[in-house]
Regions:
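Cytochrome P450
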Residues: 1-145
Length: 145
């Protein structure tokens, strides 16, 4: 966080790392329309296949230090929005824009905030996120300028 506050030019790469590390989509299932082989395993037509995005976004063959949160990670070929192609999330650009806007506005006051309670995660097997992230101004700090 201190690095981002110190260098706001990292907002874009920080947004991508947040998406990789938190994987808003947990998993999707598909049905094979033909037999195929992947990783030495044969998948038969009609069988279900599931992609677990948090696992894919920590693939040690793709990411150096995959369990480390690094806002300077480059390249960052995460699959947070379903990868690429016809199943790519139509809201991906909006989500990225919203995250950039939020961080652009919060960066000046982030050092003045502290966590004020437990983070509450969504209870959902398909999408991830938080329903509550309570924060407050640090003692003796005024947020208004």
């Amino acid at each position: 966080l201190a690095r981002l506050v110190e260098d706001p030019s990292l907002i874009d790469s920080a947004v991508e790392e947040i998406l990789r590390f938190t994987s808003p989509v947990i998993h999707f299932m598909r049905t094979a329309v033909a037999d195929f082989e992947i990783g030495g395993k044969t998948i038969r037509e009609g069988e279900s296949v599931s992609l677990w995005y948090p696992s894919a976004n920590r693939d040690e063959e793709v990411f150096d230090r995959p369990y480390e949160f690094d806002i300077g990670r480059n390249p960052n070929p995460h699959l947070a929005f379903g990868g690429y192609g016809p199943h790519f999330c139509i809201g991906a650009h909006l989500a990225r824009t919203q995250l950039r806007a939020v961080f652009g506005q919060l960066l000046p006051i982030l050092p003045k905030l502290e966590v004020a309670g437990d983070l509450v995660r969504m209870k959902n097997l398909h999408v991830g996120g938080y329903t509550a992230l309570p924060v407050r101004a640090r003692e003796g700090v005024a947020l208004a300028s």
